Structure formats: C-alpha cells, structure tokens
Regions:
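Hydrophobic beta-strand positions that form the internal "hydrophobic ladder"
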Residues: 5, 53-56, 100, 153-154
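Short loop/turn segments that connect beta-strands within beta-propeller blades
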Residues: 16-20, 74-78, 127-131, 169-173
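A short beta-strand motif characteristic of beta-propeller blades
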Residues: 23-26, 32-37, 79-83, 132-137, ...
Length: 186
C-alpha cells in the first residue's frame, strides 16, 4: 500500500447512517508500531461514544507504540482531549456519564487462552469527579470488554477457563456469571 493510504487507514472517521461521505475526525500521527494490530489492536481504535452522543472515545498508541492512552474527540472533529489515565483499553461509561469502566492493559486482541500473568486485565472504574480508580474485578484471569448497563458492568472473563459473560453489580459489589458455556468461549 502507498504511504498516503497508510496515513488514512489509521484515523477515526464518522459516516452518516444514511450513507454518504465519511468525515475524518482525527489527525493523529502514526508510528512504526502500527503493525502490531494483531497483538494490540489497531492504533486509533474507537472504544465507545460518550453517553450524550457528542464525543468519540478512541485509544491511541503514539507515545511508545505499546501503551494505549484514551482520548475523546468531538463527533464533528477538532482537538482531541486525553482522559487522564496512565493507559486504557476498551471502556464503557456509566449511564449518567460520571464514571468510566475500562481495562488498563490492552490485551484484548491476544490469542493466549487462560492467561494469568501480570498483564492480565481487570475492570477498573474511573471517577473523574473525585479522581479515583477502583479495581472492581480483581481476578487473576482476563476480565475484558466492559459494558455498563444500568447498575451492572458486564464483561468477558475466562476465570473458569472458558470465556463467559459475567456481571458486576455496582450497588452490591458482587459479580455473577451470566452465561455458562463449557466447551467453547462465548
């Protein structure tokens, strides 16, 4: 591929639901580590939208190619704003938009099964109002892809050796298994 096309394929775009021309939202630099997409996910990957639908959250790995930082950018474009966390992966806002459930380490694209090492992901909750983070899963297995719905944060985990859906209740602080696949990952 040409150098020009490489620049464009690692940016964030929006497209009208009815079709039409895509609108380029980000103008971030790329780096020589962009080839790590299979291991770390693509650079500038969209993680979610803010609950008000006005901003896009994406992860950028430009600092060193390995550590992903979360940014937001207006859906019409403009300057990106960093979410003040050391690093971040997939994430989901609380329904009121006041907290963010996220993975600190970006390992969601790794193919290792039942990894329990020091880089295993947990689900953390960031509260920008009081500038705190809390590990809500604190499990040695992979806990990834948080999705905050109501009072629960749903996520995937292989804590029982097979990847299933679990839910953490933010009121009771209890985690329950939602699916029970026993042969293949959900």
């Amino acid at each position: 591929s040409s150098a020009a096309s490489d620049v464009y394929k690692r940016q964030v775009y929006t497209m009208p639901a009815t079709g039409g021309e895509p609108l380029r939202i980000t103008y971030t630099a790329t780096n020589s580590r962009d080839d790590l997409g299979d291991r770390m996910g693509p650079n500038n990957i969209v993680m979610t939208w803010t609950p008000d639908g006005q901003r896009i959250v994406y992860r950028n790995r430009i600092s060193d190619g390995f550590s992903g930082k979360l940014f937001t950018v207006d859906k019409e474009g403009g300057l990106s704003e960093v979410i003040p966390l050391p690093e971040g992966g997939f994430c989901s806002y609380s329904p009121d938009g006041k907290q963010l459930a996220y993975n600190r380490v970006m390992r969601e694209f790794r193919t290792w099964k039942y990894y329990k090492g020091g880089m295993a992901d947990d689900i953390w909750v960031y509260n920008p109002g009081n500038k705190t983070v809390e590990n809500v899963t604190n499990n040695v297995a992979q806990d990834i892809f948080p999705m905050w719905i109501g009072d629960e944060i749903f996520f995937l985990s292989d804590r029982d050796r097979i990847m299933n859906i679990f839910a953490y209740n933010t009121k009771t602080k209890q985690t329950v298994k939602v699916t029970n696949f026993t042969e293949y990952d959900v």
